[in-house]
């Protein structure tokens, strides 16, 4: 394990957006301060990047990722496990349309077949790890109108070097206070799981944001968060299992020292 240190990249980005962000209107009518184009890089051998300046609910993150990996587009599975983060967008039957997991596991083709992008990437990692085509996309232009919410974290790519698996995510729309801490931890967890599945160590997780914004009704909460001193990142322990067989109980976040949670409204 790399030497543990305090990582302030996320908090520094919050400060940057508050200080330099351009006022913009948005789909929700809330208003934001926005910057365009930013990148964060986390060495996953140095700790699990779970924000410490507020409590982040890891159980919701992990269960949402398992739900994605199931290829599910209905919130019932999440609700049965006490996760309600998608409820605002679901219809009366719990359906969200062909959102993230559906595209990951069952991207429709013009001839009526479906592509399992995750299985495809696993195959390439095993047979051609130097490939530059290990990309998974949730941004299916032909089906955006059927999705309850267009993908914010739109696509990700894997890269292998020196026996280590790295992952880069492109997030076209980044709610920096509420969403991004979830997304960073989710894809860091995914990188751990995929690395274990194909017999690699973890490398870096690279987060790339497009429209990176703080909502106007989150400024007070962000200001409070930035008065807090970050702690070292926790560590992640994962019980061995197949990628598609994992359950939440397989995951344990160790030594997660954090400040109290800060509540804020979700822009729907």
UniProtKB/Swiss-Prot annotation:
The active site is at residue 152. One of its GO terms (cellular component) is cytosol. Its main location: cytoplasm. Its EC number is 2.1.1.45. (6R)-5,10-methylene-5,6,7,8-tetrahydrofolate binds at residues 57, 175, 267. Keywords: Cytoplasm, Methyltransferase, Nucleotide biosynthesis, Transferase. It is found in: Cytoplasm. GO terms for biological process: dTMP biosynthetic process; dTTP biosynthetic process; methylation. DUMP binds at residues 27, 132-133, 172-175, 183, 213-215. InterPro entries: Thymidate_synth/dCMP_Mease (IPR045097), Thymidate_synth/dCMP_Mease_dom (IPR023451), Thymidate_synth/dCMP_Mease_sf (IPR036926), Thymidylate_synthase (IPR000398), Thymidylate_synthase_AS (IPR020940). Pathway: Pyrimidine metabolism; dTTP biosynthesis. SUPFAM superfamilies: Thymidylate synthase/dCMP hydroxymethylase (SSF55831). The keyword Transcription does not apply. The keyword Magnesium does not apply. GO terms for molecular function: thymidylate synthase activity. Gene3D superfamilies: Thymidylate synthase/dCMP hydroxymethylase domain. It catalyses: dUMP + (6R)-5,10-methylene-5,6,7,8-tetrahydrofolate = 7,8-dihydrofolate + dTMP. Catalyzes the reductive methylation of 2'-deoxyuridine-5'-monophosphate (dUMP) to 2'-deoxythymidine-5'-monophosphate (dTMP) while utilizing 5,10-methylenetetrahydrofolate (mTHF) as the methyl donor and reductant in the reaction, yielding dihydrofolate (DHF) as a by-product. This enzymatic reaction provides an intracellular de novo source of dTMP, an essential precursor for DNA biosynthesis. Homodimer. Belongs to the thymidylate synthase family. Bacterial-type ThyA subfamily. PANTHER family: THYMIDYLATE SYNTHASE (PTHR11548:SF9), THYMIDYLATE SYNTHASE 1 (PTHR11548). This is Thymidylate synthase. The lineage of its organism: Bacteria, Bacillati, Actinomycetota, Actinomycetes, Kineosporiales. The gene is thyA.
